[in-house]
Every structure is written in structure tokens, then in C-alpha cells.
């Protein structure tokens, strides 16, 4: 359903971005960001600072929050003593600064939340040390076929968030189908987690409700023999938790809140953005965080063009999802990327940066 909001022209976007960057750089010197200078893990140890979230993707609006992401090196003492820290997070400013070793670990897994830090627009890096520049110059070391599983995993999680948001504002029979789909997704992993059982031993389906307060209801046909009671109790608990989670958040004000604040359409937009980034990594060997080419398409999704009159994702949007899944699968099959990153070269990069710190720090 069209929201009626006109998309800004590229020229207007560019002017707004330049003004934003000026204000953002100015804000970093303010009191709210004093922790960047006073935290013992940060200060002169910061290797890079950059934009995160919607500002980094180019999907921000005038009401978007500012997210800052970055990396900080270890001290000489921490390097020599084998010590480290995980990250520094400041909730008030939506800032996360990863310790260099943790960032390297996440980058090797092609973690979407961190690999995007390596693909910002040049002007979106708010600070870069020599070590930070060296890391960016070697960004391709971290690109591998692991992107398929990591990005697909994040996309699946985003799809479930979208599906959950959609279910919470749906009519009862539709919501029941969403619950059933979530249970079926969980049930796929039961054979790996619990004692084996025949494929047709647990059948889940929807039929006319016995509960007078419902139109449709989920039913179970179960045929298990000599099955461990504790495993069955755990399986039942997993399914019950899913039903309970929908019941907690599926009512009244929160549903309308999700629609009013465009949360559903934002989940839909980020799902497509993840597929786009994954395809670029697999096909081009590049991390492209700022989605200039698809900006208008992504913003149309965010603005609700692919929601119907009931605020549900349209059939067309689900077709788009399937198209992107197919593109990712094709790209994965034909990519030139290695199966895993070159651990030897990454180790050499880490050693070079650590050696520089040890020699320079007095």
C-alpha cells in the first residue's frame, strides 16, 4: 500500500547527507561522546570510527537515530600479556567499539554486523588511524563463502522478525498460521536436538477451533512409542514457548505501535538489504554497505509500498524474497571466493598491527 510520501531527489539527499556529516563530526566532540576520549580502552587506541545503521545504509530519515561503530587496538601490555576486552558499548549514543581481536574473529566469520564496517562510503569514516587504514586496505582477506551462511542466517532471523510483526497485526486465523509456521521452523531442528522419532510421528495442522474464542486452531497428531519422557517434555516446552511469545505481544496497543512506527516495513527492508549485500560479496568480492543503487526500492519498502490494506506483506513482496533467495543460491554456486578466509594472511595482518603498537608504545 502506497504511503503517499514522496522520495527525496538524489540532490536533496546529498545535501542533507553533507549537512548530517558536519553535525555528526561536531557531535563527536561533545559531552555525550566523552567516553571516546576517557575510556581506558579507547582514546588513542581507537583505530576507526564510522557510521552504522540506517545512516550507513543510506536508508535514514529525518527521525533516524545515529549509530556509531568502530574498532580499538589493544595496549602494549594487553598484547604482551595475552589480555583483551570484548567491546565498549554506550547505550545512550548507540555506539559500539569492538576490540581488535574480537572484530577480527567476527570478520573471519563474515558476520554482517561487522563486515559492513569495512564497506562504508569513504566520507562515512569519521576517524581512521594508520592501523585502521591498514585493516581497510586488507578487507578482501575476510571475504569467503562463509558469507552465504552468515548472511542467510541473519536474513532468516530478519524474516522471522518480519513474520512475527506481521502475525501480531493479523486476523486470528492468519495469526494462527504464523504461529504454526514458527513451530514448524523450530521442529525442523528437533531430530538434531532430541531422541530420534519417525518423520510422521508428530503432525501439526490447523483446523476449525474447539476453543470458542477462536476461529481456527493448531492441532497435533502424535504417535510415539518408547520415547524418552524428558526429551518429549523439552520438545513440548519449545512449542509452548512459541505459542506463549505470540500471546504476550499479539494484543492491542503494541500491534498498532508496530504499524505506526513502521517496524514491520523496516524489517522487510533490512531483509532485502541483507540479500543485496550478500550477492555483492559473492559476485563482486566487494562489501557495499551504502545501497545507493537500490535506495529508492529500499525506501519504498520502508515506506509501506509492499504492505496491503491490512498492513500485511503483499504476495508480491514474498515473490521478491524468493527471487533474492534464488540469486543468493546462484551466486553461492558460481562465486570465485574461497571456502574460508586465508588464516595465514590474516595472522600476518594482525601481527603487523600488533608489532607496530608494541614498538611505538612507550
Give the ranges of each region predicted by the language model:
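Short, Lys/Arg-enriched N-terminal segments with co-localized hydrophobic residues
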Residues: 4-18
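Helical scaffold of the NTase/Pol beta-like nucleotidyltransferase catalytic core
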Residues: 17-50
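Short, solvent-exposed loop/turn segments at secondary-structure junctions
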Residues: 54-57, 74-76, 122, 279-280, ...
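Structured mid-to-C-terminal alpha-helical surface segments
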Residues: 24-29, 141, 145-155, 159-160, ...
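Conserved NTP/Mg2+-binding pocket subregion across the NTase superfamily
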Residues: 91-263, 267-270, 289, 299
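Catalytic metal-binding acidic patch
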Residues: 53, 57-93
Amino acid at each position: 500500500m502506497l504511503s503517499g510520501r514522496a522520495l527525496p531527489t538524489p540532490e536533496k539527499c546529498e545535501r542533507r547527507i553533507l549537512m548530517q556529516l558536519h553535525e555528526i563530526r561536531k557531535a563527536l566532540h561533545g559531552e555525550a561522546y566523552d567516553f571516546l576520549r576517557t575510556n581506558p580502552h579507547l582514546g588513542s587506541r581507537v583505530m576507526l570510527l564510522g557510521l552504522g545503521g540506517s545512516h550507513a545504509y543510506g536508508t535514514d530519515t529525518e527521525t533516524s537515530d545515529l549509530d556509531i561503530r568502530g574498532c580499538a587496538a589493544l595496549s602494549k601490555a594487553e598484547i604482551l600479556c595475552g589480555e583483551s576486552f570484548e567491546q565498549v558499548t554506550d547505550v545512550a549514543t548507540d555506539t559500539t567499539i569492538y576490540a581488535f581481536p574480537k572484530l577480527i574473529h567476527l570478520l573471519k566469520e563474515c558476520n554482517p554486523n561487522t563486515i559492513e564496517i569495512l564497506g562504508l562510503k569513504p566520507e562515512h569514516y569519521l576517524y581512521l588511524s594508520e592501523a585502521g587504514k591498514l585493516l581497510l586496505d586488507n578487507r578482501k582477506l575476510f571475504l569467503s563463502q562463509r558469507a552465504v551462511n552468515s548472511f542467510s542466517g541473519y536474513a532468516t532471523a530478519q524474516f522471522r522478525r518480519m513474520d512475527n510483526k506481521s502475525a501480531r497485526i493479523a486476523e486470528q486465523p492468519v495469526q494462527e498460521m504464523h504461529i504454526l509456521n514458527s513451530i514448524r521452523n523450530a521442529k525442523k531442528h528437533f531430530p538434531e536436538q532430541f531422541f530420534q522419532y519417525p518423520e510422521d510421528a508428530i503432525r501439526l495442522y490447523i483446523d476449525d477451533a474447539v476453543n470458542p474464542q477462536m476461529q481456527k486452531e493448531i492441532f497435533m497428531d502424535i504417535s510415539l512409542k518408547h520415547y524418552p519422557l524428558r526429551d518429549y517434555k523439552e520438545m513440548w516446552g519449545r512449542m509452548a514457548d512459541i505459542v506463549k511469545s505470540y500471546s504476550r505481544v499479539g494484543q492491542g496497543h503494541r500491534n498498532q505501535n508496530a504499524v505506526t512506527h513502521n517496524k514491520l516495513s523496516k524489517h522487510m527492508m533490512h531483509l532485502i538489504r541483507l540479500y543485496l549485500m550478500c550477492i555483492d560479496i559473492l559476485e563482486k568480492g566487494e562489501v557495499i554497505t551504502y545501497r545507493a543503487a537500490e535506495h529508492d526500492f529500499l525506501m519504498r519498502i520502508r515506506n509501506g509500498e509492499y504492505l496491503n490494506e491490512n498492513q500485511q506483506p503483499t504476495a508480491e513482496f514474498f515473490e521478491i524474497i524468493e527471487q533474492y533467495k534464488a540469486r543468493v543460491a546462484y551466486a553461492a554456486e558460481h562465486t570465485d571466493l574461497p571456502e574460508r578466509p586465508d588464516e595465514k594472511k590474516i595472522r600476518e595482518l594482525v601481527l603487523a598491527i600488533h608489532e607496530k603498537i608494541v614498538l611505538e608504545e612507550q
